[in-house]
Amino acid sequence: MQSPEIVACAVAASLSVLALGGARQQAPNTRSNWPCGGRVDPSYFQVAEGTGGHLFLLAPFEIADSTPLLLAVDKHPQTIFRLAGSITPGVHEFRIPIDGSVESALFSISVQCLQTAELVRPSGALVTGEGVADYATFRAERMTIVEHPETGTWTVRASGSGIAGVMVQARTDIALVGLEFAPPPGTAFKATPVAGVENVVRLRVRGDVQDVEASIVSGAFKTIARLALTPDEGEHAYVARFSPGAGGFRVAVTGRDPHGLPFQRVSAPLFTPR
């Protein structure tokens, strides 16, 4: 059997893509440095993005120890932050709002040539101690799970280069659900936006929230456009109109929880208009 370059592994409702070094394409010394010295097939990166799956850059010998990562992702179904693409050498910081509804938060950093990865509490202290599970034995992946995280702005700090993904997922009552798209008049809703025309987007935020706003963001989590939300039928249900460009995008919603603290939820899949 040929050694696979990529293995796709389904875990419950989520799809996780494990990127492996391929013997048929890499010299022995290159393979030993996988993934930094290897080549990741971009199609598998696209699969992870298009399905909202989790991209793990793992060396072949790390697969046996990856089960806790896969199970942890499945137990944290709501996405708070997601960025994927390539990063340049140097230190990068990402600020993540954690609201009072978050029972458990999963912070994941995957960088092809990972150098450093840190998670900083709102107080400025590095994350350690009780209620923290840290998976830091992988070459290109760092995952930290924090039970009952304090509210406020957390900071993910990473350095390295190459293909990268920074994802924050949570177990929480506040969720972005029912996200659908339709060309006008907005009656035939589907999971995929229609290219070349104005779309009606329909969404609902589940949970006790207020001051809900929404925006279209890129795969690199850059704001593309603000959505002008109009209340729809149902609690915290909204519709808006926008004309998608050719590139992929996500929908991000923000607002405040019952205590007035800011929350953020993001659609995990990267939508590509068709």
What is the role of each PLM region?
Residues R95-P97, I145-V146, A228, V239-S243, ...:
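Generic structural detector for well-ordered beta-strands
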Residues M1-Q2, A8-A10, S16-L58, A64-L69:
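VWA/integrin I-like adhesion module and closely mimicked acidic/polar interface patches used
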Residues E49-T51, F56-E141, V146-E147, T153-S159, ...:
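C-terminal "exit" segments of structured domains
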Residues W34-C36, Q46, L126-Q169, G186-V194, ...:
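Noncatalytic accessory or regulatory domains flanking protease catalytic cores in secreted, cell-surface
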Residues A164-T172, H259-P273:
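Edge beta-strands of extracellular beta-sandwich domains
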Residues T187-F263:
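Conserved, compact domain cores that house catalytic/ligand-binding motifs in diverse enzymes
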Residues V177-K190, T272-R274:
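Extracellular/periplasmic ectodomains of large secreted or surface enzymes and adhesion receptors
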